């Protein structure tokens, strides 16, 4: 019986998986791959949209993190993933908030003991033995401290998981064949932004600038996963499940966070290959399957 491909996505907060990789996760899950998502915090510091759940926020009941477990569970189910995995267990590390956020009583993810956090992820990698691991670039995408920390922890864990000589971590060594950063490609972003019309937006939303600092030029891209209509629909449904954090527009072509900046909901999701050997590339120089070169068939776009 042929081996089932396994992919692991590591994210900082609930909703990051749907915003960054929702179409990719749905694409591979629908084709029978084993897909898992590790989330590093409960997202306690998130800014709540609307009045219904506003009292859950950190400055009131401080119950948002627990509520977001349900949102993440629902979102993952819509993407085809059974259940969330929390690094160190649910609630081990608190959402650190943006730079300058007041420190709370429980240990923030950015203050996690490096060996403990890395060890927790090494244990997951060695248990699940993923063929592909995905996390943020060194800047954490848009720079959130927890995204940067997730990059640091994941990079160290991928290296340590395959080390035969490191016996301090549980499990048998596993060398991850391909390690990617999730990034936002400039052409896809600008095309998506340009295509938005007033019918796609709520009245209070504004379009983002064309030169947002964390988009990547096409020549730096190594891979793209293009979700079909089903994968895109799953991504939209997953984003809608994160209702305390994300509002999906009336047409399903855009969404916004609490800052009311409209973001196109893209079916194309882009990646940089930072470890492992690339598979076949298209005329743009891009892989169109994160599993390319690993001997799996039927999982490309």
From Swiss-Prot:
Top-rank taxon, per record: Bacteria
A GO biological process held by the record: mycothiol biosynthetic process
EC number of the protein: 3.5.1.103
Record keyword Transferase present: no
Metal-binding found in the keyword field: yes
Cofactors demanded by this protein: Zn(2+)
Keywords from the UniProt entry: Hydrolase, Metal-binding, Zinc
GO MF terms held by the record: N-acetylglucosaminylinositol deacetylase activity; zinc ion binding
Catalytic activity as recorded in UniProt: 1D-myo-inositol 2-acetamido-2-deoxy-alpha-D-glucopyranoside + H2O = 1D-myo-inositol 2-amino-2-deoxy-alpha-D-glucopyranoside + acetate
Record note on cofactor: Binds 1 zinc ion per subunit.
Task performed by this protein: Catalyzes the deacetylation of 1D-myo-inositol 2-acetamido-2-deoxy-alpha-D-glucopyranoside (GlcNAc-Ins) in the mycothiol biosynthesis pathway.
Membership in a protein family: Belongs to the MshB deacetylase family.
HAMAP family attached to this UniProt entry: MshB
Protein name: 1D-myo-inositol 2-acetamido-2-deoxy-alpha-D-glucopyranoside deacetylase
